[in-house]
A protein has these predicted regions:
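Short beta-strand element of Class I
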Residues: 19-22
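Conserved SAM-binding loop of SAM-dependent methyltransferases across substrates and taxa
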Residues: 2-13
Length: 197
């Protein structure tokens, strides 16, 4: 998504605006990507910076420390008056506990906070699967159906011997599947939902 945005801004009539991307380190995502402790976030920042330079887009990358589900510190995000704010939730919200796990409902709290910032645009990308509140057997069937499609898609693009494929399957998908099927309560952090929930 960021690559496409940078490329689109580069072609904007009148020249590209200054772009500042602040990414919050989601330990679950960046650890599975091989980074851990902000390492993956650093790699993403380097790649985006190189791309922006090659497209002549004035660019600033700000990594923000990971935040627990209950603490959102706006000062760490360095939101500046007068700037157009966009919020991108790419595979993030399903990691946050909702009212089915805790009465605190950190997901709702985060969404209300984002709304209070009056962003120009909010994008949301999540898996479409009923693996949040379903009982074990229906959740197992949902996971089987969803991940069968994911593996079929991977088959099209990567050979079975591909190191990238093996890494994704072992470090991302396998961990997610085990968490969805074998964990309950607070231990389950993969909580995919269907649209409209």
């Amino acid at each position: 998504q960021w690559v496409t945005l940078i490329q689109a801004l580069a072609m904007r009539p009148g020249g590209p605006p200054h772009l500042r991307i602040t990414l919050i380190d989601d330990d679950a995502v960046f650890t599975s990507a091989g980074g851990g402790g902000g390492g993956g976030l650093h790699i993403v920042g380097q790649q985006l910076t190189r791309l922006a330079e090659s497209c002549n887009v004035p660019f600033e990358f700000l990594p923000a420390p990971a935040i627990s589900a209950g603490e959102f510190n706006l000062e760490k995000l360095d939101i500046r008056p007068g700037e157009a704010l966009a919020v991108n939730f790419a595979f993030q919200l399903h990691h946050m506990p909702d009212e089915s796990v805790s009465t605190s409902n950190h997901r709702d709290r985060l969404l209300r906070l984002v709304k209070s910032l009056a962003p120009k645009v909010v994008t949301l990308v999540e898996q479409e699967s009923n693996a949040n509140t379903a009982a074990f057997f229906p959740r197992f069937l949902e996971a089987l159906d969803y991940y069968a499609s994911v593996f079929e898609s991977i088959d099209v693009g990567l050979s079975r011997e591909s190191r990238e494929r093996i890494g994704v399957e072992q470090h991302c998908l396998a961990r997610d599947i085990v968490n969805i099927i074998a964990c309950e309560g607070d231990e389950r952090v993969e909580r995919h939902e269907v649209h409209g929930k």
